[in-house]
């Protein structure tokens, strides 16, 4: 058993070194750990500037570590070698080897080049730690040891699931949760402030500002519940299926044991997929997670759209809301302030919806025992989750928390709204109520003036019946029910 050295990351070499694979020798940069297959991918697939997300490689670290430990327990790899692979895998998980993963998203649809990138880097770093020669594949071979009992066809979908679960759990869900809490805080603060409602962009009956914002918070909560629900499918891992789902070249119960080990390492309840043919032939759990992101984007888009309309003005718009002034809004119009947080959120949501369309299309392209559209799916899902999470953080901090009400504007709209006539309809009938509205419009008077002047109702009865505060139900009860 060789001694494991305590060496800093870095080859300490310059120039080129020769590495080989089944197609022959390839020159690779001597200051990097990757090998021949990674270098071939860089040559053949240098397309655009979309790099495989680092989160995928961090997730692969968990896969390689767990597989090594399970292979050791099965007695098919020496303990020292499993320990060595696990040690380097920890460096991968921690992001210490991120610069060693240079591949583009646009590669083989199974993610084989990225799997081999991980295998080669772990192999060469492990070789370095025992004093060997980089590229020798001895004593740790990228295929025979690091990739033992595995295939790209089961490890890449597994890494996709792990990366998505971690992104959702560590970044997206917390960001949406605190945004929702801030919206609930506004709803409670403004629970009793009566405003005019709007449907079809036209005046409608009153509600309170708090009730309106409780709708935003609840819509966001429902979308967040869908995101959390999508985790259930992501917890099921394809590992153990190897090439086509049969588990060829794996020890007994390999998939179950690796999933258990990944669950232990990550703290998330990963399990083996009950049917590996479905887990590898389709990527439906990823499609579902993307659909959840789309639903969240739809909710956020509705909220942002409402806020920018309600903040329009300040003189010729609705201007019920006073939006925070983040920065000057125009290079030509002095003093102009724009709804920049809302616009940024809208663009993020549009991007997410577009990425979901790509994921859905890619998810439909599985052929027989493999869906070979893995890289585009994971790239889009992680990008959507990351941008939504970041947007929620900024939207809360600079868009929601500083919003104030223009009470005079709100009160003016309530006082002049013609839809308050709805309260009269049960008393004088729909037709007479409609006639009051038409008279108020024709004569440019208030609803009260039109009703009294037209002889439809006395002033005293009008004031008793048409009370906006009596037309909003029980706002505090509504908020209590909505938040439970």
From Swiss-Prot:
Keywords: Cytoplasm, Lyase, Tricarboxylic acid cycle. The active site is at 200 (proton donor/acceptor), 330. CDD domains: Fumarase_classII. The record marks 343 as: Important for catalytic activity. It catalyses: (S)-malate = fumarate + H2O. It is found in: Cytoplasm. Pfam families: FumaraseC_C (PF10415), Lyase_1 (PF00206). Substrate binds at residues 110-112, 141-144, 151-153, 199, 331, 336-338. It comes from the Archaea. One of its GO terms (biological process) is fumarate metabolic process. InterPro entries: Fum_hydII, Fumarase/histidase_N, Fumarase_C_C, Fumarate_lyase_CS, Fumarate_lyase_fam, Fumarate_lyase_N, L-Aspartase-like. Residues 1-22 are annotated as: Disordered. It is an enzyme of class 4 (lyase). Pathway: Carbohydrate metabolism; tricarboxylic acid cycle; (S)-malate from fumarate: step 1/1. GO terms for cellular component: cytoplasm. Its EC number is 4.2.1.2. GO terms for molecular function: fumarate hydratase activity. Its main location: cytoplasm. The keyword Cytoplasm applies. NCBIfam families: fumC_II (TIGR00979). Involved in the TCA cycle. Catalyzes the stereospecific interconversion of fumarate to L-malate. Homotetramer. Belongs to the class-II fumarase/aspartase family. Fumarase subfamily. There are 2 substrate-binding sites: the catalytic A site, and the non-catalytic B site that may play a role in the transfer of substrate or product between the active site and the solvent. Alternatively, the B site may bind allosteric effectors. This is Fumarate hydratase class II. It comes from Methanosarcina acetivorans (strain ATCC 35395 / DSM 2834 / JCM 12185 / C2A). The gene is fumC.
């Amino acid at each position: 058993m060789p001694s494991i050295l305590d060496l800093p990351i870095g080859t300490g070499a310059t120039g080129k070194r020769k590495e080989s694979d089944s197609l022959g020798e390839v020159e690779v940069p001597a200051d990097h750990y990757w090998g021949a297959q990674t270098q071939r991918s860089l040559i053949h697939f240098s397309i655009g500037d979309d790099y495989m997300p680092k989160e995928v490689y961090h997730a692969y670290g968990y896969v390689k570590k767990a597989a090594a430990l399970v292979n050791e327990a099965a007695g098919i790899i020496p303990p020292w070698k499993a320990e060595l692979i696990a040690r380097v895998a920890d460096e991968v998980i921690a992001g210490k080897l991120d610069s060693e993963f240079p591949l583009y998203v646009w590669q083989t649809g199974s993610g084989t080049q990225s799997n081999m990138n991980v295998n080669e880097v772990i192999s060469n770093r492990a070789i370095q730690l025992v004093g060997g020669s980089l590229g020798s594949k001895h004593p740790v071979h990228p295929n025979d040891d690091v990739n033992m009992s595995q295939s790209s066809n089961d490890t890449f979908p597994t890494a996709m699931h792990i990366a998505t679960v971690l992104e959702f759990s560590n970044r997206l869900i917390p960001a949406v949760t605190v945004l929702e809490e801030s919206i609930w805080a506004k709803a409670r603060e403004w629970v009793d402030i009566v405003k005019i409602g709007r449907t079809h962009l036209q005046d409608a009956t009153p509600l309170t500002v708090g009730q309106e914002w409780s709708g935003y918070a609840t819509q966001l909560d429902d979308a967040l519940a869908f995101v959390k629900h999508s985790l259930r499918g992501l917890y099921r891992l394809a590992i153990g299926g190897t090439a086509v789902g049969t588990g060829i070249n794996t020890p007994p119960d390999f998939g179950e044991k690796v999933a258990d080990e990944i669950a232990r390492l990550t703290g998330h309840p990963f399990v083996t997929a009950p049917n590996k043919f479905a887990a590898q032939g389709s990527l439906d759990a990823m499609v579902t997670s993307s659909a959840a992101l789309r639903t969240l984007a739809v909710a956020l888009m509705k909220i942002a759209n409402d806020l920018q309309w309600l903040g329009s003005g300040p003189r010729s718009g609705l201007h019920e809301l006073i939006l925070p002034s983040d920065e000057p809004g125009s290079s030509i119009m002095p003093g102009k302030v724009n709804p920049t947080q809302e616009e940024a959120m809208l663009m993020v949501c549009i991007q997410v919806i577009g990425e979901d369309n790509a994921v859905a299309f890619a998810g439909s392209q599985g052929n027989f025992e493999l869906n070979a559209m893995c890289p585009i799916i994971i790239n889009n899902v992680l990008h959507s989750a990351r941008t939504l999470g970041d947007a929620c953080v900024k939207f809360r901090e600079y868009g929601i928390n500083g919003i104030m009400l223009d009470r005079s504007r709100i009160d003016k709209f309530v006082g002049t709204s013609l839809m308050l006539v709805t309260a009269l309809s049960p008393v004088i009938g729909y037709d007479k109520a409609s006639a009051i509205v038409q008279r108020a419009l024709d004569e440019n008077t208030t609803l009260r003036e039109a009703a009294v002047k037209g002889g439809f109702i006395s002033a005293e009865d009008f004031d008793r019946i048409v009370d906006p505060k009596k037309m909003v139900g029980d706002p505090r009860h509504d908020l209590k029910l909505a938040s439970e």
